[in-house]
């Protein structure tokens, strides 16, 4: 069966939803060789993955994942990575900011793949440990306001493909599927993507899977997987069974533009220091503004604010008062 799919891919033809599912099932059953899996992943990449293929992968990978039984629906804020921009961990800062505002957050993340510091690397540098216990993470979400989900603990099938992916050394369909695999009970998601084409494909894949309330975005002018303050950001908003496309520029809500270099990060320790300064409200205004605007869009998606402008002003004031730092210190068992 795998050889038939390989032949189809080599001819530049797309797999169906069910055929893509079969590929993942063959990985799970260990019926596909490493050579065949490498060929499938490279072939899909060369011809271009389509929404049905992404949806098929996500469907099985999510079904096989260990689930987080949180009672209170949560939001996830993450990105695909792979934009080669080396920004600091903006979505991680947003996750703690939202939680400090009373929004339940299920932060799904991993270690660095293409950047110097993945979200989990930075979260650990901030002094937090990752649990592999679904019940413990659910309690963290329900009682503390934020749970940290280290992806490899919860996605055994993905783990079976790690060796081949590492040896290939390129982005594959797993990079698109990964951010769509949060195993917690979600009420919404904001998801940054490294390219416009992939963003559209991921949105359409989510529509096929009947997912809802997901805001996909891509910083078009500077090519980042964040809502940008250096230029235009394009969005695909999946809500109530349809996808709306729109764009945003900083001037739309009265924010000045910043140079892309303003948001450069470093290793995990350096990025943790940047986040600490943001949480305290003593960071550069550019850093506070980009966290505030990304947080504002999440609040808007969740219906917590009527406009992004309202959300931005509220979040910026909250950060400047050091409220995020107070919350983070409480999580760490300290008094700010």
Swiss-Prot record:
Keywords annotated in UniProt: Amino-acid biosynthesis, Aromatic amino acid biosynthesis, Glycosyltransferase, Magnesium, Metal-binding, Transferase, Tryptophan biosynthesis
Binding site for Mg(2+) 2: 225-226
Keyword Cell membrane: no
Reaction(s) catalysed by this chain's protein: N-(5-phospho-beta-D-ribosyl)anthranilate + diphosphate = 5-phospho-alpha-D-ribose 1-diphosphate + anthranilate
Binding, Mg(2+) 1: 91, 226
Pfam families for the chain: Glycos_trans_3N (PF02885), Glycos_transf_3 (PF00591)
Binding note for cofactor: Binds 2 magnesium ions per monomer.
Pathway assigned to this chain's UniProt record: Amino-acid biosynthesis; L-tryptophan biosynthesis; L-tryptophan from chorismate: step 2/5
Ligand binding (5-phospho-alpha-D-ribose 1-diphosphate): 79, 82-83, 87, 89-92, 107-115, 119
InterPro entries per the UniProt record, alphabetical: Anthranilate_Pribosyl_Tfrase, Glycosyl_Trfase_fam3, Glycosyl_Trfase_fam3_N_dom, Glycosyl_Trfase_fam3_N_dom_sf, Nuc_phospho_transferase
Binding residue positions for anthranilate 1: 79, 110
SUPFAM superfamilies the record matches: Nucleoside phosphorylase/phosphoribosyltransferase catalytic domain (SSF52418), Nucleoside phosphorylase/phosphoribosyltransferase N-terminal domain (SSF47648)
Cofactor: Mg(2+)
One Gene Ontology cellular component: cytosol
One of the GO BP terms on file: L-tryptophan biosynthetic process
Molecular function GO labels: anthranilate phosphoribosyltransferase activity; magnesium ion binding
Enzyme class: transferase
Residues annotated as binding anthranilate 2: 165
Domain of life the protein comes from: Bacteria
EC id: 2.4.2.18
NCBIfam families associated with the record: trpD
UniProt-listed PANTHER family: ANTHRANILATE PHOSPHORIBOSYLTRANSFERASE
UniProt similarity note: Belongs to the anthranilate phosphoribosyltransferase family.
Function per UniProt: Catalyzes the transfer of the phosphoribosyl group of 5-phosphorylribose-1-pyrophosphate (PRPP) to anthranilate to yield N-(5'-phosphoribosyl)-anthranilate (PRA).
Subunit structure, interactors included: Homodimer.
Name this protein carries in UniProt: Anthranilate phosphoribosyltransferase
Organism encoding this protein: Dictyoglomus thermophilum (strain ATCC 35947 / DSM 3960 / H-6-12)
Name of the encoding gene: trpD
């Amino acid at each position: 069966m795998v050889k038939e799919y390989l032949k189809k891919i080599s001819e530049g033809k797309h797999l169906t939803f069910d055929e893509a599912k079969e590929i993942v099932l063959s990985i799970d059953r260990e019926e596909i060789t490493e050579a065949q899996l490498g060929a499938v992943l490279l072939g899909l990449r060369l011809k271009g993955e389509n929404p049905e293929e992404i949806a098929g992968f996500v469907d099985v990978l999510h079904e096989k994942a260990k689930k987080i039984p949180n009672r209170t629906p949560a939001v996830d804020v993450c990105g695909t990575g792979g934009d080669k921009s080396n920004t600091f961990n903006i979505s991680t800062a947003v996750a703690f900011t939202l939680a400090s505002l009373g929004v339940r957050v299920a932060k799904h993340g991993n270690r660095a793949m293409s950047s110097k510091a993945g979200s989990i690397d930075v979260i650990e540098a901030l002094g937090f440990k990752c649990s592999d216990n679904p019940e413990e993470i659910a309690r963290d979400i329900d009682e503390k306001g934020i749970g940290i989900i280290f992806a490899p603990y919860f996605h055994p099938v993905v783990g079976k493909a790690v060796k081949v992916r590492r040896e290939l050394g390129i982005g594959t369909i797993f990079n698109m599927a990964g951010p769509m695999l949060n195993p917690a009970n979600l009420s919404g998601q904001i998801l940054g993507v490294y390219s416009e084409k992939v963003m559209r494909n991921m949105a359409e894949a989510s529509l096929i899977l009947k997912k809802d309330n997901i805001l996909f975005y891509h910083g078009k002018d500077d090519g980042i997987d964040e809502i940008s303050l250096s230029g235009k950001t394009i969005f695909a908003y999946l809500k109530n069974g349809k996808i709306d496309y729109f764009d945003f520029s900083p001037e739309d809500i009265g924010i000045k533009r910043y140079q892309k270099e303003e948001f450069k990060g470093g290793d995990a320790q350096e990025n943790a220091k940047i986040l600490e300064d943001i949480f305290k409200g003593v960071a550069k205004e550019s850093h506070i503004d980009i966290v505030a605007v990304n947080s504002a869009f999440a609040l808007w998606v969740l219906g917590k604010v009527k406009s992004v402008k309202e959300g931005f002003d509220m979040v910026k004031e909250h950060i400047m008062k050091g409220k995020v730092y107070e919350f983070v210190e409480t999580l760490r068992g300290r008094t700010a």
